[in-house]
């Protein structure tokens, strides 16, 4: 058994000297404390037989000279059916007070991405039941989806609604990785999943805001390893939710500074693209099964050009951008219909009718955006009749993009709506064709299908 001694402790970073053989990079080391066993992960070889490690838990109670044992392998976690319905931490230990896991299979969290010839490349649409997403930025089965937004514009609520809509209808396995977010939200999600019965097909892996940077950096890999096992061993189509991928980058930046690396742009770690690539390339579909991932991406100061969101962009198949301007109009989900994109929005994938309606909707909204300056200065009266009609339809389209969510029922008092793609296309096509030009725009706010808008307009007229 390879043993070493602690020589230096700086916050979450611990240096350890080994007399004989040095442990490999990413090996897990263990230190016995009074009430627990602390796990450290090797990050650097410094020379003079010293390795630099990052702690996966608080370093309180550590002292220089303490004995450290090399496990000879990376952090290894339980996977398979045993983890369903349970909450795990970064080390795969249950933290839900429901007894030990009786897992048969264990896997290291550091693994290679699938081989090139194992990948599956067919494109199939994933229906979410959320109008604005299904119409303008449709999600791909086995694809990577990013939800971009600043603080408080609704990323987590949207992720919870997607879990509610997709996980319930999907019937497959879901894995939720809570990376550096609020513990309260994690608790709420667990409660909601337990109530709806989805929990029996879900594994939750949490490394929240209060955890040290090492745990926040690695917890996404723990969740991903659980999802990979369901894909590879059981041939499942797995849903992987990550909230929030920015915190993964943020933790990497903290660890990088503690390890003494020279920072790059905006103070981020120099290996930002490499770290992100190592995670994202493992989230993919193979011949045996698929992983569809939905990742919330916090955008610092609403700046999409910040290196963290910008690096994430390049890995995604669909991006749903949440806008503070739309949220300020009281339209939720606050998805920006002109900024959100999807590789699947092409005639070959979604079909001619869907593609044409989506493009026409974007055209009308873009024209409205151009006219807003004129309206602000000269007022609506100065517009031509054609432009007035465009503005009227654009405002109806904007409001029709709003939708009551099931997960927000307790706050809004409105019953959540799931709208099939066919109904979404039909509704927007009818607005574009002018069939509902006589209906006031308020009738389109927070309804599901177009019939509900018509019914609401009759109620308003009473």
Swiss-Prot record:
Record: residues binding ATP: 149-156
An example Gene Ontology molecular-function term: ATP binding
Top-rank taxon, per record: Bacteria
A UniProt-annotated Pfam family: ATP-synt_ab_N
Keywords, sorted A to Z: ATP synthesis, ATP-binding, Cell inner membrane, Cell membrane, CF(1), Hydrogen ion transport, Ion transport, Membrane, Nucleotide-binding, Translocase, Transport
Known catalytic reactions: ATP + H2O + 4 H(+)(in) = ADP + phosphate + 5 H(+)(out)
Disulfide bond keyword on record: no
Membrane topology annotation: Peripheral membrane protein
Gene Ontology cellular component annotations, sorted alphabetically: plasma membrane; proton-transporting ATP synthase complex
Keyword Cell membrane in annotation: yes
Subunit structure: F-type ATPases have 2 components, CF(1) - the catalytic core - and CF(0) - the membrane proton channel. CF(1) has five subunits: alpha(3), beta(3), gamma(1), delta(1), epsilon(1). CF(0) has three main subunits: a(1), b(2) and c(9-12). The alpha and beta chains form an alternating ring which encloses part of the gamma chain. CF(1) is attached to CF(0) by a central stalk formed by the gamma and epsilon chains, while a peripheral stalk is formed by the delta and b chains.
Similarity section: Belongs to the ATPase alpha/beta chains family.
Protein name (database record): ATP synthase subunit beta
Organism, as annotated: Fusobacterium nucleatum subsp. nucleatum (strain ATCC 25586 / DSM 15643 / BCRC 10681 / CIP 101130 / JCM 8532 / KCTC 2640 / LMG 13131 / VPI 4355)
